[in-house]
Amino acid sequence: PNNAMKENIIGLDASAYNLENGKIVRTKMKRDVVFKERVGESRMNLKFSIPQVKAGTLIEYEYRIESDFFFSIDSWKAQSDIPILYTEYNVTIPEYFKFNIEMHGAEKLETVNENASLNLSIGSQLLRCSGTHLNFQGNQLPALKDDSHVWCADDYCTQVNLELQGIDFPGSLYKSFTQSWEQIDETLLKDSDFGSRLKMNNPLKEEMTALHLEQMKGADEKICAIYTFLKNKVRWNEKYALYSKSPKQVLKEGTGSNADINFILISMLKDAGIPAYPAVMSRRDMGILPYSHPSIQKLNTFVVAISPTDSTLVYLDSSVENGYLNVLPPVLMTNRARIIAPDNHSQWVNLENVGANLLRSSVKAGISSEGVVTGTRETVYIGQYASRLRNKYRTAKDSTE
């Protein structure tokens, strides 16, 4: 619709600079190499090609973003996977908008804060006000490349983040946008695709009677039986999520995200009298949760925290095909996960070392008088090692693998 909030990129310009016969030659981008690509119902990508780019070429581009989303300013990343000779970021904030401004990264940015006067359009009114103009400059910034030993390179990228703290218009009450983690807990618990899933009845209640859980001795045995039963019903589609679709749809399709399956698992465990809760997090390859302020936008998935006794917690996630208690995929073994529980009982947990991972081999052998060594080797796989072995066995073409 015409009155919908939107965001546009304007003033795009780009050039390539090459050294030819001792002279710097500039080649400007033409408009016919700029095009749009739709990537969703409400999102488009603007793509462009810079001409005459080759090894040693210096490229330069600039653009301006006009956005109606005043409450959400994208992070500005000063570094890239190529060296940056010079980069600059400007933002002007009207006095009525209060932002938390966070800078982090190893490289230094030059910053300048100046008073500014500007005209602010509010509906049909034009309001003249003061504000602050922020200028950030980076010079000679090294390339920041992915590394096999680093989960998320963006965690180390020199960048500027702005998050709206509140709005204070004259004649109006101050409106706060700052949230505590307790408020985020409440928001999630009220969400129809999150909190409502925690209240749903077990959709596999009748079928689960075939497990005869009442004959099992310990909670661990019951948990594993329920988990295995569910995994035989629904296959993980290799997608991680925070919110879920209808459990009826998930069971009908026989596949779903880890969130889709985890919510069903929680309902089954509760039905068996075993307390279970979602432990929300940011995946390790999606960046760490900010320490400076709570952020629901940074949450992107969860695992299931299970309390078989009042004093213990164990963890499961439906993305693990051949796992066991406390065997999580490494991408979910974060140092900050938040267990979402009602009545203000939420808590932070560290999932980096939730279970023992051990590979132990012992060899019993003897040497005959002819110098021939014979014997046996016994190998014990525990935790992640056991899960990997089961996966390898399950996907092997034949016994020789």
PLM features: residue spans?
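Lumenal/extracellular ectodomains and adaptor appendage modules
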Residues: 1-88, 355-401
